[in-house]
Amino acid sequence: MKRVLLILVTGLFMSLCGITSSVSAQTGGSFFEPFNSYNSGLWQKADGYSNGDMFNCTWRANNVSMTSLGEMRLALTSPSYNKFDCGENRSVQTYGYGLYEVRMKPAKNTGIVSSFFTYTGPTEGTPWDEIDIEFLGKDTTKVQFNYYTNGAGNHEKFADLGFDAANAYHTYAFDWQPNSIKWYVDGQLKHTATTQIPAAPGKIMMNLWNGTGVDDWLGSYNGVNPIYAHYDWMRYRKK
């Protein structure tokens, strides 16, 4: 009987270890991405569908490109009258607590968003957890920080930059820990959140899109295209 019990306990322990290893394997480690070429082992491009609701465009892989300047460029284009294509790049793996940094130059135009964020949700079989750095193209002298925990948001915070982010590259970051999120601009702390902190690992995402029905937030998109957001590099340091 003791031997049978030992076998059962050992089997359960090995099973749990397997589950733990599987979860760990799905969560990526520290890395630096210079965006000199496209790494399909690390990234994937959204293609052929729309998020709907306030997103007034279709994601196209062709709207994510690498330039001769050694940067990733996301494009907002119009293939036909009043139809719009946009660009989104996201990690293959999910990532958890740590420091997320990006050196980027957002697009400038009313009615659009350029972003850097982590996201996971029901399509991944998890709660909707998200941490955002967003630039509203109507005023790129400000940056918006936000986060969602199990679908609950309303944590928006605007920070004045003291410069126009669309004119030159700057470094933006957030340090995500179990009890806090801290957002930085060029190494300077701009905002700290300490309540309802998300816990589920998410994919690293960057996108450029035009909105509809959210004019109070973004302003009305005027159809100007092509428009570009530029990403020089990004880095994740696991903590």
From Swiss-Prot:
Keywords in alphabetical order: Disulfide bond, Glycosidase, Hydrolase, Signal
Domain GH16 as annotated: residue spans: 26-239
Database matches in SUPFAM superfamilies: Concanavalin A-like lectins/glucanases
GO terms of biological process kind: carbohydrate metabolic process
Cross-referenced PROSITE patterns: GH16_1, GH16_2
InterPro entries per record: Beta-glucanase/XTH, Beta_glucanase, ConA-like_dom_sf, GH16, GH16_AS
Superkingdom in the source lineage: Bacteria
Span of the signal peptide: 1-25
Reactions catalysed, as given in the entry: Hydrolysis of (1->4)-beta-D-glucosidic linkages in beta-D-glucans containing (1->3)- and (1->4)-bonds
Enzyme Commission numbers on file: 3.2.1.73
UniProt entry tagged with the keyword Protein biosynthesis: no
Active site: E134 (nucleophile)
One Pfam entry name: Glyco_hydro_16
GO molecular function, one term: licheninase activity
Note: Beta-glucanases of Bacillus have a substrate range similar to lichenase of germinating barley.
NCBIfam families with a match to the protein in the record: BGlucanaseBglS
Family, similarity comment: Belongs to the glycosyl hydrolase 16 family.
Protein name from the UniProt record: Beta-glucanase
Species per Swiss-Prot/TrEMBL record: Bacillus amyloliquefaciens (Bacillus velezensis)
